[in-house]
């Protein structure tokens, strides 16, 4: 299981104990003589952790940073004084250390400002993302409402179309029945016309017979009583 990063404040003694660990690989303290004066130079290097910004990360103020650096310098000067030389011998080294620490402070402050700017950018982007999420949610709700309305319209349209189809189908059935009735009536009329035609033919035959009889009677009358 991966260990979570952590940090803590350490004293000079704890700093000395950590020299044999992996974080600090080399610590050099040099004493130099020049024209009867001695100076001490402190340098160290190694692999250090990279601090990343987390939601719970808290930045120290300039005042707190100055106080921490002041305490560190005081502890370092006391340790060097007790170990190597008097205060008079450490003035030059103290000045150099102060310069290095001041440069380190400037670097830390610069990175702190950059981190603060990046944090503001991230927070602003987070607000924009939240606004976009709210807008997206509203658009999704509006889209769902439109889809519901469209679905209802489609259902109503389909139901209305089905009703119209049912009505048309009923009317078609009624028209079919009426056509069947009319067809039956036409068949009946046609039968009646055929019967009338037959009767007319019979009447015509009888008329022809009567006409022949009249002609015969007229001929007989002419024989009996010839015209003068």
Curated annotation (Swiss-Prot):
Coiled coil: none
Domain of life of the native organism: Bacteria
Pfam families membership: DUF16
InterPro entries cross-referenced by the UniProt entry: DUF16
This protein's name: UPF0134 protein MPN_137
Xref: Gene3D superfamilies: 1.20.5.170, 6.10.250.40
Similarity section: Belongs to the UPF0134 family.
